[in-house]
């Protein structure tokens, strides 16, 4: 049976332990995701306390990180989601995503409504992917795919 968290504290403390153990052991996020049958982005989000993992994946990841049965239980718990407390993010990388939505949010909203109608794009029935590609002009580019199910607004 899955259990729900009542505050973000336990998962946040676990995330700090995950990051420390990952660094101590020289593991990558991909190393942790390999063999779970779950997307890299979802496993990483779970490690940061934003998703629950199935038992087998939680056990595998916890074992790789040298964590105990309590950690396995926490990794399976349904978290209080939302990792940016206090409004506008101050971390430069996270802020760029915030900035993208500040610039393109109303455009995305208008295009979603024009193409789909009144509704939302789900962040629950959702897939996220990130790829590093070479930029023909030099350097690298990040290709980020947000793939969410459209949910129409229904009158009641």
Curated annotation (Swiss-Prot):
Decide whether keyword Lyase is in the record: yes
Name the InterPro entries on file.
Cyanase (IPR008076), Cyanate_lyase_C (IPR003712), Cyanate_lyase_C_sf (IPR036581), CYNS_N (IPR048564), Lambda_DNA-bd_dom_sf (IPR010982)
The active site is formed by 96, 99, 122
Q: Describe the reaction catalysed, as an equation.
A: cyanate + hydrogencarbonate + 3 H(+) = NH4(+) + 2 CO2
Organism's domain of life?
Bacteria
> Which GO biological process categories is it annotated with?
cyanate metabolic process
Q: Name one GO molecular function term.
A: DNA binding
EC id:
4.2.1.104
Give the keywords, sorted: Lyase
- Is the Transmembrane keyword given for this protein? no
Function as written in the Swiss-Prot or TrEMBL entry: Catalyzes the reaction of cyanate with bicarbonate to produce ammonia and carbon dioxide.
**UniProt xrefs under HAMAP family:** Cyanate_hydrat
- NCBIfam families, from UniProt? cynS, PRK02866.1
In the record, the note on similarity to other proteins reads:
Belongs to the cyanase family.
Quote the protein name from its UniProt record: Cyanate hydratase
From which source organism is this entry?
A: Pseudomonas aeruginosa (strain UCBPP-PA14)
The gene for this chain is cynS
């Amino acid at each position: 049976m899955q259990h729900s968290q009542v505050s973000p504290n336990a998962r946040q403390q676990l995330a700090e332990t995950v990051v420390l153990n990952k660094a101590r052991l020289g593991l990558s996020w991909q190393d942790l995701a390999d063999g779970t049958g779950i997307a890299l982005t979802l496993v990483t989000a779970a490690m940061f306390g934003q998703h629950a993992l199935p038992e087998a994946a939680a056990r595998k990841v916890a074992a790789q990180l040298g964590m105990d049965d309590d950690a396995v239980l926490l990794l399976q718990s349904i978290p209080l989601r939302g990792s940016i407390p206090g409004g506008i993010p101050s971390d430069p990388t996270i802020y760029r995503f915030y900035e993208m939505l500040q610039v393109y949010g109303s455009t995305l909203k208008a295009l979603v409504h024009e193409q789909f109608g009144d509704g939302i794009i789900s962040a629950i029935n959702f897939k996220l992917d990130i790829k590093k590609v070479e930029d023909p002009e030099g350097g690298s580019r990040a290709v980020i795919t947000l793939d969410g199910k459209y949910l129409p607004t229904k009158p009641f």
